[in-house]
Amino acid sequence: MTVTTSSPATAEGRTPGIGRVARVIGPVVDVEFAPDELPEIYQALEVDRTIGGETLTLTLEVAQHIGDNTVRAISMQQTDGLVRGAVVRDTGAPISVPVGDATKGHVFNVLGTPLDVDKVDAETRWSIHRQAPAFDQLESKTEMFTTGIKVIDLLAPYVRGGKIGLFGGAGVGKTVIIQEMIRRVAKEFGGVSVFAGVGERTREGNDLFLEMTEAGVIEDTALVFGQMDEPPGTRLRVALGALTMAEYFRDVQKQDVLLFIDNIFRFTQAGSEVSTLLGRMPSAVGYQPTLADEMGVLQERITSTRGHSITSLQAIYVPADDLTDPAPATTFTHLDAQTVLDRSISDLGIYPAVSPLDSNSRILDARYLGQEHYDTAREVQRILQRYKDLQDIIAILGIDELSEEDKILVNRARRIQRFLSQPFFVAEQFTNIPGKFVPLDETIDSFKRLSQGDYDHLPEQAFFMCGGIEDAEKNAENL
């Protein structure tokens, strides 16, 4: 097995040392070493603990140097049963995870240990602490990432190698969009996906694994979980472990990668807990003073290099719906697009329940997409916004009280709203409707003609859950 993690300590020719536990306070462990054997920051340490006659090995990560002979480390597992004086081994390298094809179809923890099988035969392991790509290695051009999902491609297009925020409550279809994107990357583009469950409920992670297995997309996906009940050190590092696996697929195998992080807020929350445990003075609203730095270390590694990319879809929880909270506000500065799932749209049975008015993208601009795409998107949004403005009048007075022009616009908006729905491949077993991949040119042309009134004669129901405009015309013939 190849381990590509060279430690500064071993590079200097120094043999990794042996220390002893001096103090244990929850997940924080102080370890004493000889002054000339002090481990580097981020170095992994190992210590054995015995509970009920069973000996388990704990992994610690060095976070601080205290004096000349003591390090303060954060445990990646529960420290129950750990005692003062226990022997601690310096591994001579940071925490590493397996990388490569062997990781596909499996579930791992933060240490790279498989959770679904006993062993994974990976030839190479990479350190989870890596530098972001150098400036001269980055892809200089901005390129759209075509998903084949109409509402996203038209109104909130994704950036290849960009970062997308996915906002959505429970039951609005967030998991289905994640599964569909994984399937499309694998089947349409031959790419691979990596999923990071940060602070996930164990039940949710298990459900996702089983659903992905049933949908047939697990073979092209690696999953890394740090559950909600695990120490903050685990939840802080699990996203870096998943990102490291994604970087290998991008840099060595030259593949386009889709990286999911659910939930990025839990990453910030774990960092706040670790910061408090280390005795740092809290900053605004109690968050860690290093919040922007920690977020930047993660986000700057998610990017496009020459010809290949990591595109990230990040679920974001907004505390008390306060967008000015430091946690989401720090995340927003890194996002290239925002996909907002709206419960009122899902209540209408329209899926994906993406809000066409609340979702946005940095590249929704004629300079990146072309004038036709931009003009079509803005016209669709104008019609839908006018329809939204008229809904109170319709609810109180009825549609007959509107002007003839507004009546036409409302009927057109309802057709557009239904045409934004689309059958997904991973939902075929539930809907019995074959999934559709709609090319970008077809999406633009269909909505352009629809917004001009070319299809006002077709019934509304014909536009529901179809792919291209030809499907709507076929549906109209059958109604």
From Swiss-Prot:
Chief location: membrane
Signal peptide: none
InterPro entries, sorted: AAA+_ATPase (IPR003593), ATP-synt_VA_C (IPR055190), ATP_synth_F1_bsu (IPR005722), ATPase_alpha/beta_chains (IPR050053), ATPase_F1/V1/A1_a/bsu_N (IPR004100), ATPase_F1/V1/A1_a/bsu_N_sf (IPR036121), ATPase_F1/V1/A1_a/bsu_nucl-bd (IPR000194), ATPase_F1/V1_b/a_C (IPR024034)
EC number(s) reported in the record: 7.1.2.2
The protein's enzyme class: translocase
Subcellular location: Cell membrane
Transmembrane segments: none
Annotated residues for binding of ATP: 168-175
Annotated keywords: ATP synthesis, ATP-binding, Cell membrane, CF(1), Hydrogen ion transport, Ion transport, Membrane, Nucleotide-binding, Translocase, Transport
MF (Gene Ontology): ATP binding; ATP hydrolysis activity; proton-transporting ATP synthase activity, rotational mechanism
Family: Belongs to the ATPase alpha/beta chains family.
Subunit details: F-type ATPases have 2 components, CF(1) - the catalytic core - and CF(0) - the membrane proton channel. CF(1) has five subunits: alpha(3), beta(3), gamma(1), delta(1), epsilon(1). CF(0) has three main subunits: a(1), b(2) and c(9-12). The alpha and beta chains form an alternating ring which encloses part of the gamma chain. CF(1) is attached to CF(0) by a central stalk formed by the gamma and epsilon chains, while a peripheral stalk is formed by the delta and b chains.
Function field: Produces ATP from ADP in the presence of a proton gradient across the membrane. The catalytic sites are hosted primarily by the beta subunits.
UniProt-recorded name of the protein: ATP synthase subunit beta
Taxonomic placement: Bacteria, Bacillati, Actinomycetota, Actinomycetes, Frankiales
Gene: atpD
